[in-house]
């Protein structure tokens, strides 16, 4: 089958993941789909990744280290497939994943997203899927949700298949090193989003994730996330298809940005951080999540805004570090015995 007849390209991007990349590649080859091609891009790894990749026999390229976004663009240039899945080298597809995904790859679809099971560095399951399947059922108008909150329910990078024109937006995202920004955020404005509630892949959580999942809470990282989000929203507003229903996104009124401002204020010990609560609570109450979730989110943000700074920081860690999401960890955070 020639490159022009493939319906989907899976681009595996790798940097120093010698211990995982063979499993990632093997999980794609095991799908046994003639209408899918596999392309591996090694982003100048300094470990044994390239040797491992070559042994698999797949079509692979080794380039000078330039970051995930550049590696994925390089891979995109090697295929003409109309849909692309960027698979991180530490993640995997589960058996039958592409059989479930490919029938949905239609011209009007901008993105197909699916759930990922969370595993640790050793492959042990960590509990519930991401996102939770129930959240996929509460979609509503995703464009309006992005305008109001700055986000929508979406899996990490490896849980998405993008139409090619969305991937082309990466070329102008020189403010970003990753690929899970503009193309995820812009997808609802470019076509339909198909959400599959099945667990079709594995997402590895460890301290080397590009997303930062599994790391501690750090003020500089929060600031970086806020600046990245600001750049991403500006990019979205530039490329958003213009019609009467698609107004620009105002970053300063979105849930994502307001929440990060409050979290940053709590982490650095900013006096008067509670003054940020009204705007944030207004966005939470207007969201489409069920009342119980609104109550939990509202309670969390009220607590981190009024508790002593040390307790507030502990509570933030409980929420944002998966390994700390236990009843005991929450009790320790609230009583100041988290350390």
Model-inferred region functions:
Residues 19-22, 46-54, 92, 96:
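Acidic helix N-cap motif at the loop->helix transition within catalytic regions
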Residues 77, 138-216:
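Conserved nucleotide-sugar donor-binding catalytic segment
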Residues 84:
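Short aromatic/hydrophobic "clamp" motif used to bind/position activated sugar donors
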Residues 27, 42-51, 88:
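A conserved acidic beta->alpha catalytic loop
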Residues 63-79:
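Glycine-rich, basic loop-to-helix element that forms the pyrophosphate-binding segment
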Residues 68-71, 98-104, 108-166:
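Flexible acidic/His/Gly-enriched loops in nucleotide-sugar-dependent glycosyltransferase catalytic domains
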Residues 16-30:
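Short, well-formed alpha-helical segments that are part of the catalytic scaffolds
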Residues 148-150, 156, 177, 204-339:
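C-terminal subregions of glycosyltransferases and related glycan-biosynthesis enzymes
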